[in-house]
Amino acid sequence: MGVFDYKNLGTEASKTLFADATAITLYTYHNLDNGFAVGYQQHGLGLGCRHTGRGVARQHRLPGSDPPAFPGILTRKRPPWTRCTQPVGRQSSASALGYGGKVDARGTFFGEKAGYTTAQAEVLGKYDDAGKLLEIGIGFRGTSGPRESLITTPCRSGQRPARRAGPQGLCEKLCRRTFGGLLKTVADYAGAHGLSGKDVLVSGHSLGGLAVNSMADLSTSKWAGFYKDANYLAYASPTQSAGDKVLNIGYENDPVFRALDGSTFNLSSLGVHDKAHESTTDNIVSFNDHYASTLWNVLPFSIANLSTWVSHLPSAYGDGMTRVLESGFYEQMTRDSTIILCPTWSDPARANTWVQDLNRNAEPHTGNTFIIGSDGNDLIQGGKGADFIEGGKGNDTIRDNSGHNTFLFSGHFGQDRIIGYQPTGWCSRAPTAAPTCATTRRPWGPIRC
């Protein structure tokens, strides 16, 4: 089974579903973490950390930092999203659905019951060339808010219901209490347009991922069972449903993804918590400044240690997990493969640190290791086993430590150099064209009147 294979869809259909779910999830944040991502990329978490913070503030002030359009999610007729311009048709979503709840100028839907009113969700549609509705996408935003209320909204959106219900209770009740009416309206709208639950994709990140798991758990007993066959992909969810109804995607070194034992809080939640679950990816590592630094790792790995949260950012998931999807090694990867990703590697750290499997704060890694580089000039080091190394773009330096590694050079891979290479009777392969994920995708856009 491939890393992101879901239900019985097959590899190519699962890839398309994953790409759509990622696009929907990133859209729900309206590019919220762009400021930090830019500052971190330029300055990292070391001595440049203060510059990273300055970049966050600067990015949130500058008109030029408005969220761009996300390819594959907006309709052809819809102009790029900006903070000042209301996109054509966006506000029509609520009226098109026949929904009377709270909605803002962006078309974002808000929680319906007291104590949950700052929860936020998006409803998007996918259409054919004739304008016929093909699929509906539901995206739940994580514990955050729009950029203009960056502090106040997160403080209200998730903590209050979490304190009241606890993880297990929150997971069971979140969707019913926050968007029960909206989800009924969407189900009625979908049925009126000839769609079934199989035509609905539900996605979200962090607390939004928890909402995805909550909706999946309730899908058979609520909303007349309409959503029982829907597709559920959650990113960085602190809770993971049992069974295979939800694909829970997360980094091994994301403290939020590893906070709970399924839906139970225990003492291990405050430290290293690496239990495998049926519905989760368990060995994908975001090789970032924190993971690589011996100094940063003197502090305990914990959800209470804010420096570990660099692996939790939406942008880290959008870029990193897409690298897995587009890798030439994808066919060789499985759900339990050890995969090291470094697209969230800052420029200062990239210049003098070797990307490798450090196996930090986790159960021992076994089997083959896949290391996928970034678009920059990476230093990549294989281990003693049979590693699969793909440098990516840029001029990479790759160190071979075993003589049993497989190297993939594809597309615009730059001027790469291998040191310590020990031939074992066969050569690394060099395709003439970049491996591609050749699937037909239609854009997601607002529900139309």
From Swiss-Prot:
Catalytic activity: a triacylglycerol + H2O = a diacylglycerol + a fatty acid + H(+)
Broad class of enzyme this protein falls into: hydrolase
Alphabetized UniProt keyword annotations: Calcium, Hydrolase, Lipid degradation, Lipid metabolism, Metal-binding, Repeat, Signal
Calcium as UniProt keyword: yes
Region of interest called Disordered, as start-end residue ranges on this chain: 58-77
Name of the protein described by the UniProt record: Lipase
Thermal behaviour (record text): Thermostable.
Source organism per UniProt: Pseudomonas fluorescens
Domain of life, per lineage: Bacteria
Per-repeat ranges for Hemolysin-type calcium-binding: 372-389, 390-407
InterPro entries, per database record: AB_hydrolase_fold, Hemolysin-typ_Ca-bd_CS, Hemolysn_Ca-bd, Serralysin-like_metalloprot_C
Family per similarity comment: Belongs to the AB hydrolase superfamily. Lipase family.
